[in-house]
Amino acid sequence: MGKYRVIAGQNLYDIALHIYGSIEGIVDLMMCNTDLSLDTTLKVGDELIYSDEFIINADVVAYNEMHGIVPSNGEHHVYPKVFTKPLAVAFALPTQILSVQCSVSGVGTLEIDWGDNSDTEVITLTDKPQLLKHIFDNKVRKRRRIRWFTDAYFKQVDWSGLQPTSVVILRPLPIEELTIKDATLTLDSLQMVTGIYSLNLSGLTSGNLKPLVECRELMTLNLTDARIKPTVLDDWLIAMVERYGNRRNCEVTLTAVPTGTYQEPARNADTGHYNITSGMEAIWVITHEESWNEGGKWKFIINDKEYSV
């Protein structure tokens, strides 16, 4: 007699096809395992006894062995998933990812569609961050998608473990502290995040930081080890001066360095306005404009060197 160990996603028919080359092999499985029935729910690691010299279709068995195929179809949803909250965020992930995780805290309810055959996961948010882990039960040919349905208020959110290639926020989303580390992303959707005062984008790869200009409530911005061109930093910093408006003072941490010299820029002879030509000049203006530093001082930390007044 042989022993067969069940793997993820397998049902009784998968195992019969793998061992005997035909689903008719379930008869032998139930004869060898008297407590087994068509209603039995198999779990990963379960062991089944089978007649090791009994094969119904040798060609199928040989083909599976030759191509390394292990039947694993599992159970699939027949009916659409139902959600009670509005669609708030859509993520796109690389196809090769097998498992993900994220953490959340706040007030309200979050419904997650993991984009596979699993049921909707419903999370009641609490003040303490909850680590959510998921192993995908299917394969996809194109990008994998995850959807969040919620109208909750989030205190802390960490999307780093999702490894997203795209984040699309579809409605105003209140988040106090957001972390997305080591991601390659466009940041346009961050304009839909409200009430955010701490943003950790360390390790970010992006070709445009201008969407950050609209994050006016930020008090902490971490861009450590971000792979960003100096000219991209320049465009963001200059745009922030030009569209400063009503915003909080912020502590910005960088390892990439903007162009230029930290000095007062020249003024336009006609208007008297600064003619800013580099990112470092923009930082000088931000840190030296008195009205922008009344409630608290702006601080830029670039490779451990502090620029402030």
Language model regions located:
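C-terminal low-complexity, glycine/proline- and small-hydrophobic-enriched intrinsically disordered tails
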Residues: 226, 242-243
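Cell-surface/extracellular proteins and modules involved
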Residues: 1-111, 118-203, 207-224, 235, ...
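Membrane-proximal C-terminal cap and juxtamembrane stalk of leucine-rich repeat ectodomains
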Residues: 248-309
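Leucine-rich repeat
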Residues: 228-237, 266, 274
